[in-house]
């Protein structure tokens, strides 16, 4: 029994120690907790929330902990607001940086509008001033010097036209009539019309003419610059062709070994070409005709060179003509078109002349190859070789004359002479064959070089 009583006492004592002590702090906390529960329950009571009792409101408002919590929440809200404001400001900064160019553009537009308004106002003021009698007197005074300047321009244009006619009246070849001679006549025929037009125009149209003249002069300068470029290109092409011809001649010159017979056949080939052009047949046989034929071809080349030089001089004279000679607007374009057509005709004529020249050179090369295959080197017995060559080519046969002068006295002498003659023929034949082989090789090389040069020239023409 005692043990049970002791255990019961111990349990009661433990319970007593475990119970909390009611202090004033704990009482205030319990009130606050009850009020908080009441507020939560009232706020959650739906659909009709209950109002909080005034005692709970007083306790909650008087508790510093709740006030600090509420203040902390307010601080958080304020911090959130500040963060949002900072983000907005950061987002607005690049927009602000982009705004100044727009503002500048707006300012520029405003300035332009102001300038336009000011210019419009100036024009209006000028119009009103021009309508006044003083302005009319001023215009009349300004028109007098403008007329003087126009007359001076006309005099200078006439002097330049006279100089241009003097330059263009030089000797020109009649083989190729040039249409370039029409340009000064056109300028002369059209310039009086322009002079009369300028005289008949009213003074009010003079400013408009002064405004149009720079455009016409610019068009004429462009046309002249294009003509100069085309002329330079032509001159460069001619120089290149002349250099190629000189190189081909230098290559072909040392390899050819002209002999008396080859030179005679060479001149005969030139004469045959000149026969086609209308020359007499007697020049192909006589020795004097050979020299005449050899001099005729260089003279033709000189005439053609002089013709080309005169054409270039005429074109330079056209370039040097004053701008006042060319009519303005569509007339200037027509003249440019005519000049282009004339240049095309000149190019075509030059191409035809070059084709003829190369065809002649090809014919001469073929004749030389055919001749040198049958020719041989010089031998001590010149008369025998000449007789052999004349028989091979079918010219006048001096064989009977040699036989008449060479008459053997006896049969033995004739037999010995025949044997010597046959031996000489064999020796000459072997020597001729060797020489012919060498010449054939050299001629084949020359022909190959000529073909290469011809192909290059054709490629240059096409290009």
UniProtKB/Swiss-Prot annotation:
Residues 88-440 are annotated as: Disordered. Glycans are attached at residue 430. It holds the Pfam family Granin. Belongs to the chromogranin/secretogranin protein family. PROSITE patterns: GRANINS_1, GRANINS_2. Its main location: cytoplasm. Keywords: Amidation, Calcium, Cleavage on pair of basic residues, Cytoplasmic vesicle, Disulfide bond, Glycoprotein, Oxidation, Phosphoprotein, Proteoglycan, Pyrrolidone carboxylic acid, Secreted, Signal. The keyword Nucleotide-binding does not apply. The modification Methionine sulfoxide is found at residue 384. It is found in: Cytoplasmic vesicle, Secretory vesicle; Cytoplasmic vesicle, Secretory vesicle, Neuronal dense core vesicle; Secreted. Residues 196-208 have a biased composition (Polar residues). InterPro entries: Chromogranin_AB (IPR001819), Chromogranin_CS (IPR018054), Granin (IPR001990). Residues 1-18 form the signal peptide. The keyword Lyase does not apply. Disulfide bonds join 35-56. Self-interacts; self-assembly is promoted in vitro by chondroitin sulfate attachment which occurs at mildly acidic pH conditions. Interacts with SCG3; this interaction is optimal in conditions mimicking the lumenal milieu of the trans-Golgi network, i.e. pH 5.5 and 10 mM Ca(+2). Interacts with ITPR1 in the secretory granules. Binds calcium with a low-affinity. Residues 134-160, 301-310, 331-340, 348-375, 409-437 have a biased composition (Basic and acidic residues). It comes from Mus musculus. GO terms for biological process: defense response to Gram-negative bacterium; defense response to Gram-positive bacterium; mast cell activation; mast cell chemotaxis; mast cell degranulation; negative regulation of catecholamine secretion; positive regulation of cardiac muscle contraction; positive regulation of dense core granule biogenesis. The lineage of its organism: Eukaryota, Metazoa, Chordata, Craniata, Vertebrata. GO terms for cellular component: chromaffin granule; extracellular space; neuronal dense core vesicle; perinuclear region of cytoplasm; secretory granule; transport vesicle. The modification Glycine amide is found at residue 329. This is Chromogranin-A. O-glycosylated; contains chondroitin sulfate (CS). CS attachment is pH-dependent, being observed at mildly acidic conditions of pH 5 but not at neutral pH, and promotes self-assembly in vitro. The modification Pyrrolidone carboxylic acid is found at residue 438. The modification Phosphoserine is found at residues 119, 220, 282, 308, 350, 383, 410, 414, 430, 444. Residues 92-116 have a biased composition (Low complexity).
């Amino acid at each position: 029994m005692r043990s049970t009583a002791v255990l019961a006492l111990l349990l009661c004592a433990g319970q007593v120690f475990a119970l909390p002590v009611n202090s004033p702090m704990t009482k205030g906390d319990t009130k606050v907790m009850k009020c908080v529960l009441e507020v939560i329950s009232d706020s959650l009571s739906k659909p009709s929330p209950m109002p909080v009792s005034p005692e709970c409101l007083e306790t909650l408002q008087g508790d510093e902990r709740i006030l600090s919590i509420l203040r902390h929440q307010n601080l958080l809200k304020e911090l959130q607001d500040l963060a949002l404001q900072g983000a907005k400001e950061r987002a607005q900064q690049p927009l602000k940086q982009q705004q100044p160019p727009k503002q500048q553009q707006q300012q520029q537009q405003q300035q332009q509008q102001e300038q336009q308004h000011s210019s419009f106002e100036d024009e209006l003021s000028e119009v009103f001033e021009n309508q006044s009698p003083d302005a009319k007197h001023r215009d009349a005074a300004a028109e007098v010097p403008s007329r003087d300047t126009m007359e001076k321009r006309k005099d200078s244009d006439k002097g330049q036209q006279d100089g241009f006619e003097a330059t263009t009246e030089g000797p020109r070849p009649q083989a190729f009539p040039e249409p370039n001679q029409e340009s000064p006549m056109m300028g002369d025929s059209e310039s009086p019309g322009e002079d009369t037009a300028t005289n008949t125009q009213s003074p009010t149209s003079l400013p408009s003419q002064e405004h149009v003249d720079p455009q016409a002069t610019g068009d004429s300068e462009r046309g002249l610059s294009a003509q100069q470029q085309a002329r330079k290109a032509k001159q460069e092409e001619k120089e290149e062709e002349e250099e190629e011809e000189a190189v081909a001649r230098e290559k072909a010159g040392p390899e050819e070994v002209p002999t008396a017979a080859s030179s005679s056949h060479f001149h005969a080939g030139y004469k045959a070409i000149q026969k086609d052009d209308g020359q007499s047949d007697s020049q192909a046989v006589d020795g004097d005709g050979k020299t005449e034929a050899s001099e005729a071809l260089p003279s033709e080349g000189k005439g053609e060179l002089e013709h080309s030089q005169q054409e270039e001089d005429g074109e330079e004279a056209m370039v040097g003509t004053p701008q006042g000679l060319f009519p303005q607007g569509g007339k200037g374009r027509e003249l440019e078109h005519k000049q282009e057509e004339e240049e095309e005709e000149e190019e075509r004529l030059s191409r035809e002349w070059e084709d003829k020249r190369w065809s002649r050179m090809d014919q001469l090369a073929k004749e030389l190859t055919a001749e040198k295959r049958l020719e041989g080197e010089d031998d001590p017995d010149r008369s025998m070789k000449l007789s052999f060559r004349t028989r091979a080519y079918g010219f006048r046969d001096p064989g009977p004359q040699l036989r008449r002068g060479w008459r053997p006295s006896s049969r033995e002498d004739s037999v010995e002479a025949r044997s010597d003659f046959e031996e000489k023929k064999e020796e000459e034949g072997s020597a001729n064959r060797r020489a012919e082989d060498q010449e054939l090789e050299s001629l084949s090389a020359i022909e190959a070089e000529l073909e290469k040069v011809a192909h290059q020239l054709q490629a240059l023409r096409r290009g």
